[in-house]
UniProtKB/Swiss-Prot annotation:
SMART domains per record: PTPc, PTPc_motif, SEC14
InterPro entries the record matches: CRAL-TRIO_dom, CRAL-TRIO_dom_sf, CRAL/TRIO_N_dom_sf, Prot-tyrosine_phosphatase-like, Protein-Tyr_Phosphatase, PTP_cat, Tyr_Pase_AS, Tyr_Pase_cat
Subcellular location: Cytoplasm
Coiled coil spans: none
Catalytic site: C515 (phosphocysteine intermediate)
Its EC number(s): 3.1.3.48
GO molecular function, one term: protein tyrosine phosphatase activity
Homology family: Belongs to the protein-tyrosine phosphatase family. Non-receptor class 3 subfamily.
BP GO terms, sorted: negative regulation of neuron projection development; positive regulation of protein localization to plasma membrane
Protein name: Tyrosine-protein phosphatase non-receptor type 9
Major subcellular site: cytoplasm
Species the sequence originates in: Mus musculus (Mouse)
Keywords attached to this entry: Acetylation, Cytoplasm, Hydrolase, Protein phosphatase
Length: 593
């Protein structure tokens, strides 16, 4: 089925021949995607909106389309019902509105009144829904599409209780790269002294071009940037606004016409199964040749800077359970907690004083929910918890990427029997060593777990990777790539022995992966596994996206820029070995930088 290109409607905005041609190209590209996901083709007018925002640069407009779609999906901005609560009250709060005047260039003027925002009263996702809804009403106008948007952030009369750093970051990210509007400038008016610190944090996330458009002004300075005819009275202008009633005009007669993006957002991922993964192909995936060119362009310093962009992002979620006084002794490192939202919960048992806490997180793999459990190297006081987790999660494979000691420091406890036929008892679980195989770069141990309460036995394969240096990263990824393949094969074979599971009737049990803290080498191993799986299936991958999404599940995954750079290096090394690029060609990008 070939993608259909939407015809130019009679009421479409007037475009130049070049702009019309760009619109046709954009629709051809996007509608390949809509056909793939079996959704309605994008309309001509919607296409023009995205192209206007990027001055009819087709590639940049396609990127914007996917950023907009992904942002709406991520923030739950779908099937909006402005006449229903809580969205109706948020729209009518007046904290955000579109003025009924334009600046001298014809740009629309959006106004956010900070003193009306009370984070403890308004759910952040509802605030974002209202913001999207009202901005969409503004850019329905061809004049706004053509002439852009001025955003005023009015902080007059506000205090710290009205400010929400995470919301501010999301709004700026939206305006700079995820909404179809030309952002002309952002005027921050009447900012208190305390605002300098959070603004310095936010500004680090912005490109220079966007940062140049942001100006922090005193109230008396606003008229130097916009005439009084364009400003509300409280900012020295002539525009009368009753914030309590002004936004009534933006409510539709009924809940409005269906939003074409609802279908696109809801259908852009596979059906919502219980085991959907965050690691699915995204819009910015690179081919292997594009990756080579990208690394050559960015060089080592640029890749390190890319990691810093990831590192600066605040963790998504909370750490209440990890930081609970009763659980602190179960954390190997005080600064490596695990997220409440993805933590593995142990079953509490009668007669035992244990909590359900272990420093371990469920992590998705490529197109597989909970493919891994990322965890710290077990402590003596958590051995029993570790094996209980392995039993309860029906784990078949354990991957250890550290030694017991490195650089004279203890990295992990000896939580399994090392010698053949030896056994260790952990409560009602007894672990027996059935045999050890010593390879060049790793050790493979077959273990049997006997649950004396349930009178059941299971086999688990334990791999210990031995070729990671005490400091830094391996000079070559060859041994790790080989090791990864061995682990994959063992998991596939073990799952196949389970019968029904191998036919996809229920999700595979996770692979337990740990190092010492459970974030550095663990994150590197899992990132490489995900990227190579996508590369082998589709011929594309995105390291930045993979690591960013991974950190939403196992916070702080990949600890250093060196480990992040190693992921790129390992992928290129793999591609060269597999003949995806000419021998020696890809690694030229990695040398001497």
């Amino acid at each position: 089925m070939e993608p259909a290109t939407a015809p130019r409607p009679d009421m479409a905005p007037e475009l130049t021949p070049e702009e019309e041609q760009a619109t046709k190209q954009f629709l051809e590209e996007i509608n390949k995607w809509t056909v793939q996901y079996n959704v309605s083709p994008l309309s001509w007018n919607v296409a023009v909106k995205f192209l206007m925002a990027r001055k009819f640069d087709v590639l940049r407009a396609v990127e914007l389309f996917h950023c907009y779609r992904e942002t709406r999906r991520k923030e739950g901005i779908v099937k909006l019902k402005p006449h229903e609560e809580p969205l109706r009250s948020e729209i009518l709060s007046g904290k955000f509105t579109i003025l009924n005047v334009r600046d001298p260039t014809g740009a629309s003027i959006a106004l956010f009144t900070a003193r009306l925002h009370h984070p403890h009263k308004s759910a952040q996702h509802v605030v974002l829904q209202a913001l999207f809804y009202l901005l969409d009403r503004a850019v329905d106008s061809f004049e706004t599409q053509r002439n852009g948007l001025v955003f005023i952030y009015d902080m007059c009369g506000s205090n710290y209780a009205n400010f929400e750093l995470d919301l501010g970051k999301k709004v700026l990210n939206l305006l700079k790269g995820a909404f179809p509007a030309r952002l002309k400038k952002v005027l921050i008016v009447g900012a208190p002294i305390w605002f300098r610190v959070p603004y310095s944090i936010i500004s680090l996330l912005l490109k220079d071009k966007v940062r140049e458009r942001i100006q922090i002004l005193k109230t008396s300075e606003v008229t130097q940037h916009l005439p009084r005819e364009c400003l509300p009275e409280n900012l020295g202008g002539y525009v009368k606004i009753d914030l309590a009633t002004w936004n009534f005009q933006f409510l539709p007669q009924v809940n409005g016409h269906p939003d074409p993006f609802d279908e696109i957002i809801l259908s852009s991922l596979p059906p919502a199964l219980d085991w959907d993964s965050v690691h699915v192909p995204g819009p910015h995936a690179m081919t292997i040749q594009e990756l080579v060119d990208y690394v050559n362009t960015r060089q080592k310093r640029g890749i390190y800077e890319e990691y810093e962009d990831i590192r600066r992002e605040n963790p998504v979620g909370t750490f209440h359970c990890s930081m609970s006084p009763g659980n602190l002794e179960k954390n190997r490192y005080g600064d490596v907690p695990c997220l409440d939202q993805t933590r593995v919960k142990l079953t509490k048992r009668s007669g035992h004083t244990q909590t359900d806490y272990i420093n371990a997180s469920f992590m998705d793999g490529y197109k597989q929910k909970n493919a891994y459990i990322g965890t710290q190297g077990p402590l003596e006081n958590t051995y029993r918890d570790f094996w209980l987790m392995v039993w309860e999660q029906k784990v078949l494979v354990i991957v250890m990427t550290t030694r017991f000691e490195e650089g004279g420091r203890r990295k992990c406890g000896q939580y399994w029997p090392l010698e053949k036929d030896s056994r260790i008892r952990f409560g009602f679980l007894t672990v027996t060593n059935l045999g050890v195989e010593n390879m060049n770069h790793y050790k493979k141990t077959t273990l049997e777990i006997h649950n004396t309460e349930e009178r059941q036995k299971r086999q688990v394969t334990h791999f210990q990777f031995l070729s990671w240096p005490d400091y830094g990263v391996p000079s070559s990824a060859a041994s790790l790539i080989d090791f990864l393949r061995v682990v994959r094969n063992q998991q596939s074979m073990a799952v196949g022995n389970l019968g029904a599971r191998s036919k996809g009737q229920c999700p595979e049990p996770p692979i337990v992966v740990h190092c010492s803290a459970g974030i550095g080498r663990t994150g590197t191993f899992c990132s490489l596994d995900i990227c190579l799986a996508q590369l082998e299936e589709l011929g594309t991958l995105n390291v930045f996206q993979t690591v960013s999404r991974m950190r939403t599940q196992r916070a702080f995954s990949i600890q250093t820029p060196e480990q992040y750079y190693f992921c790129y290096k390992a992928i290129l090394e793999f591609a060269e070995r597999e003949g995806m690029v000419p021998s020696g060609h890809s690694l030229l990008a990695m040398d001497g930088q």
